[in-house]
Structures are given as structure tokens and as C-alpha cells.
């Protein structure tokens, strides 16, 4: 492996390695919630995902003739995120393929640490969702007893997405929504825990709030002004205020929206790097996400939206840099001309 690239990756690891360490450990509370809802199977799935991601890291180190270091937890954090985006009933081979796709195709193919243009966790999830939709986008109800190894006989459904897509309103009380007591990916329903994790990442200066806030605000505004619920779009704004707000609640708390806003959107190497760029980046992901949710076939369309906007995040950065230089060059040129 090129020595200059190795040194650059070591510098990047010193710069952003703490982000992945924090994400790794903050996935643990969500895993605990998943175990509370579904028993020991989420622990088994996350353990297998971690082992797969770590073995990929060691294999790539061997192939590239470099020393493996346990300071880099990016593979492990991507693996945990992929596992938490899965239903607790997913077959083990599907999860393993998703982790392999995310780590090897989403990350290592592009050069490894810090060189990838697409979020590796979103890549892994997208590959699994497209290849095995019946496994990835159908979920068991919380508190359903799950066998440890083979959960193929457990009843699963896509009730949440079916209800929203047909123009209905979720029959869930507020406490059930914020605690995640509904059929969803095993680590994405507990809104209170996810928000607490986001607060920790923000206080540790691992993430910037601009991208996440603009993403959630954009999704909320679209859900409020263009609701999917039957009859709301044709009614006046004030006469349907409460149903519209409930629709916003339902949209933001399902489909792994909050989870992705905290754990995927601010990934250091795929998010825009400047303040205005991050706001635009989050808004674009929000627009694309609602487009996928309204017109697509996957409840977790946010992962596909993220991949789509990842393709232009570098362009957003370059455009902002050019505008910044242009706006600061014009006053200096005028000043020089006046002198």
C-alpha cells in the first residue's frame, strides 16, 4: 500500500477516530433497548456484525501489507449501525452480506479510511434491502419471543408503512412512539434514547447540529404541508392542524428518520464540511427522503436518499468555497481600486 496514503489515513484517524469510538459506544444503549423488546437475539446479531466487520478490517490490513490497529473502530461502528437498522428477525446470512457490502464495497474499495464518497452503513443496508426486501423491511412486534438462531417462523409485517402509505394515521399513544413500542428496525424506534445519544455526540463536538436540524425540519415541513393522510391535503391548514402535527410525529418517528439524523447524516467523510453546505446537505437529504417515502417502496428510504445526496456533497463544498472566495475577493478588489 502506498506509504503516503497510509500516513494520510493515520492523520485522518487521529483527527476523526474519536467520532467512531463514540458512535460505537452510543450504539450500546440502543442495543439494550432492542434486547428489552426482543430478547437475546439482537445481541447475537450485533455480535456477529461486529465480528464480521472486524475480520474484514484484519483481512484488508493483510492484503494491503499494513499492520492492523485496534484504534480504528470505523468498521465496527458501521457494522453496528447496519445491524441496528435490521429487523430482529433477519437471517444471519443477510446481515453478514450487508456488513460485507458496507465495509468492503462501501469503504475499502474506495481506498479505506476517509476515502469513501458514500456512507458505508447506508451502502450495506441498501444492498440488503434491495436483495432481500422480505427479510429487511418487515418487522416483528415488540415483546414477541424470538428464537435465538432461526426466527423465520416469527410473524412479521410492514404495518407502519402500509398504514402511512394508505393514508391512515398510526393508532399509537405518544409514550409508545417515543419509547419505540411499535414494529420497526430493532435499534431505531426508541426516540428518547436516540435523542440522548445525539446530545452526547453534539456536546462532544463530534457532530454539527446544522445538517441534522435542517434534515428534520425539511422532513417535518413536507409532512405538515403535504400530508399523506387521507383528506388532510384538501382541508384548510387551521382546521386540520392537530392531524397534520400527528402526521409529522408519525413520519419523523418511523422509517429510522431520527436514527439516521443522529448516526448516519453527520458521518465525517460523506457529509458536507462547511456550515451553509451542511444545512443545504441536510435539506437535500430531507427532500429526497420524503420523496422515497411518498413514492418509493421502502420505509427506510432515508438510506437511499443519503446515498443519492452523498454523490453531490463534495460539489456542495466546492461551490460554497468558490462563493466564499468570490464574495471576499470583490470587496478587496474594490478597496484596491479605490486606493
For every predicted segment, state its role.
Residues 26-33, 53, 57, 75-84, ...:
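Hydrophobic, membrane-inserted alpha-helices
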Residues 1-61, 333-339:
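N-terminal signal-anchor module of multipass membrane proteins
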Residues 7, 55-67, 103-114, 196-204, ...:
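C-terminal ends of transmembrane helices
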Residues 117-121, 249-257, 278, 296-309:
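Loop-to-transmembrane alpha-helix initiation sites
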Residues 1-22, 292-339:
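Cytosolic-side transmembrane-helix boundaries in multi-pass membrane proteins
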Residues 68-78, 95-100, 115-125, 209-217, ...:
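Cytoplasmic-side transmembrane-helix entry/capping segments in multi-pass membrane proteins
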Residues 39-51, 89-98, 181-191, 243-257:
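Structural signature of hydrophobic alpha-helical transmembrane segments
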